[in-house]
A protein has these predicted regions:
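A helix-coil-helix interface module used to build multimeric assemblies
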Residues: 1-175
Length: 175
């Protein structure tokens, strides 16, 4: 199977170069965002009359099946396809035929990865925020138990005046 970028080359890349440049091991975690971005793009293509409603439905149904396969761990990854985007696109074309290729109308790989990364970061930042709020909740609960508990305060890594544990813990809540 030829690579997307292989049109001008007489021979394939050396296997070590393929291992070095392949990103599937890293970007496979982007599959939820890749599916979301592709669903949104397919809807935009239909609104622009570049896909018929039936083509849009077919793409959406195919992407839903791929999402289910990925979530269940049954998706047939093909490392020779290099990245998650190409794996999903090829699987979509296998499932629904040539209409799957229309999904990239007006969208470059750079557009696709930029969307995927932004969606991924948005999702991860939300999860980090949830985790931080949980840490704050635990610190507040522990501070409530340490209202009268003294501990040494530090200045320039030297023990200084005594402080209340609750005050010390609540300082971390507001950092």
């Amino acid at each position: 199977m030829s690579k997307l970028w292989s049109g001008r080359f007489a021979a394939g890349a050396h296997p070590s170069a393929e291992r070095f440049t392949g990103s599937l091991a890293f970007d496979r975690r982007l599959w939820p965002q890749d599916i979301r971005g592709s669903l949104a793009w397919a809807a935009a293509l239909e609104r622009a009359a570049l896909l018929t409603p039936a083509e849009h439905r077919g793409i959406a149904d195919g992407l839903a099946r791929i999402r289910d396969e990925l979530a269940a761990g049954t998706f047939p990854f093909r490392p020779e396809l290099e990245d998650i985007h190409t794996n999903i696109e090829r699987r979509l074309t296998e499932l629904i035929g040539p209409t799957g290729g229309k999904l990239h109308t007006g969208r470059s790989r750079n557009d696709q990865i930029a969307v995927d990364e932004r969606l991924y970061l948005k999702d991860v930042c939300a999860a980090v925020g949830d985790g931080l709020r949980e840490v704050q909740r635990v610190l507040i609960d522990r501070a409530a138990q340490g209202i009268e508990m003294a501990m040494p305060g530090y200045t320039h890594l030297q023990r200084a005046q005594p402080v209340v544990l609750a005050h010390h813990l609540l300082a971390y809540v507001f950092m």
